[in-house]
Regions:
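N-terminal small-residue-enriched
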Residues: 1-470
Length: 470
């Protein structure tokens, strides 16, 4: 069925919902055509392609939510979902503590086309495999006998989402995302080191064609090799400078999740009750911006049909706002800001980040480190996790560089940092004019995965706990 046909069916379902006197109804069609493959040590470890399409319908009836979905494009199946959702809502209403309220937002009627040069759905799997093999072979050649493991992956997805609700919104959004990545583990005796590089954008297969091996697998291989001869990082408290990749990891894990308003209303965030107060150093601002062209985490409309926006979380140290759905905005008495996203048709929209970052400052990296007698520069952000309600976080860096007498010195390995979120951000003393937004990821929350990105400038912390070798 054509996109126009899907829109007409959604409008028809919306009209049926209105006949049944529900307070609110939202019908959302979603389809994805995707492919992916992964090589491991020269072998095809995973290859696949597929297409899924279906519809999910949410209703508010008697003050309660109901939801049902079907992997189908048949109107009869959609109508059955509507009836099931209404029945669920009315049963739930009998056990309701407080009725569902949704914030008002102007109705949107729009169609968004995907922007790309080479449609990945038209590129053969053989061509995709050849590109991935080229990346892996370049890394193997660079690493030689010190290779312990090579992994190279490619994924693409073409999405269509159509949102239609009883408030007059009818929004169709298309997007194409492509990702390629390489991870290499090197070994020298008992020492093993890992490095990885990722390129991911809202783009087609042209992303792969514009990414030479030396910028992806070659870069990862060079780092993994150099780390074999590096000494372990020292453990203790030090002044630390974060590379933009570590900055992105920190703001995503430590602030971004805490700023999701569903965590606020559930009492699971350290930012609860702190709106309008100082939560970071004066030099720190934090934004989540869904409007950046081509970025992995961007979108024109969220899964409730609300325009994506640039959302200010922290401005010059003051907590200004949170990421909201229609429901959380109503609960907190603020305007919605387009932060509700759903992973496919079978999931309900929940509050999610997009591109989360600290905006750049005015200092150079050289100026940032000039007064540090002994400290560390952390680069190559790899992973992190956060306990939202406790305000604790851990971030692991793929590489560290010692700072001695105001200058970059020797490379170190096996370094991580941990601390209390607000304490760390209060100890930021300077940020750089250099800026990167290159931490694309598929973030998991409540069983849903969503495209997000993160980044920022170099950030100087007065003192932080570094995990290494004592």
């Amino acid at each position: 069925m054509t996109k126009t046909g899907m829109q007409e069916q959604l409008e028809r379902l919306r009209d049926e919902a209105m006949k049944r006197k529900v307070e609110f109804a939202e019908a959302r069609f979603a389809s994805v055509t995707s492919s992916g493959l992964m090589l491991q040590d020269g072998r095809a470890d995973r290859m696949g392609a597929g297409k899924r399409a279906g519809m999910g319908v949410r209703v508010v009836a008697n003050g309660a939510w109901g939801f049902a979905s079907a992997e189908s494009t048949e109107f009869g199946d959609w109508f059955s979902c509507l009836e099931a959702a209404i029945e669920m809502a009315r049963v739930s209403a009998q056990r309701l503590d407080e009725p569902v309220l949704l914030a008002d937002v102007p109705a949107a009627v729009d169609e968004v086309q995907a922007e790309f040069e080479i449609d990945p759905t038209t590129v053969s799997i053989e061509r995709k495999l050849a590109a991935v093999q080229g990346y892996e072979e370049a890394s193997a050649l660079r690493v030689g006998e010190r290779v312990a493991n090579l992994m190279t992956g490619y994924n693409d997805a073409r999405h269509l989402e159509i949102v239609c609700n009883t408030r007059g919104t009818l929004v169709s959004s298309e997007s194409v995302r492509t990702m390629v990545w390489h991870a290499v583990t090197t070994q020298d005796g008992s020492i093993r080191q890992r490095a990885q590089e990722i390129r991911a954008q809202q783009a087609g297969f042209e992303l792969v064609e514009a990414t030479p091996a030396e910028e992806l697998s070659g870069k990862a291989a060079a780092l993994a090799l150099s780390l074999l001869s590096a000494q372990p990082a020292p453990a203790g408290k030090f002044p630390v400078v974060f590379h933009p990749s570590i900055t992105g990891l920190l703001v995503h894990e430590a602030i971004g999740h805490n700023a999701e308003a569903d965590h606020i209303v559930a009492g699971q965030s350290i930012l609860e009750g702190k709106a309008g107060t100082r939560v970071t150093a004066d030099c720190v601002s934090i934004v989540d911006d869904a409007t950046i062209p081509g970025s992995w985490g961007s979108y024109r409309y969220d899964s409730e049909g609300v325009p994506g926006q640039r959302r200010v979380i922290v401005e010059k140290g003051i907590l200004k706002g949170f990421l909201h759905s229609l429901e959380t905005a109503a609960k907190m008495g603020v305007a919605p800001n387009g932060s509700a996203r759903a992973d496919g048709f079978a999931n309900r929209p929940i509050v999610r980040m997009s591109n989360t970052m600290i905006p750049p400052g005015e200092m150079s990296l050289e100026e940032l480190i000039s007064d540090i007698d002994l400290g560390l520069l952390l680069r190559a952000g790899q992973w992190g996790y956060v306990w939202c309600e406790k305000g604790q976080y851990t971030c692991h860096a793929g590489e560290g560089v010692m700072i001695r007498n105001g200058e970059l010195a020797e490379q170190v390995r096996d370094v991580s940092v941990s601390g209390m979120t607000l304490e760390t951000l209060a100890n930021v003393s300077a940020i750089s004019s250099d800026f990167e937004l290159e931490m694309p990821n598929n973030c998991g929350k409540n069983g849903q995965r969503m495209a997000v990105n993160g980044g920022g400038p170099y950030v100087k912390i007065k003192e932080i706990v570094v995990g290494g070798q004592a």
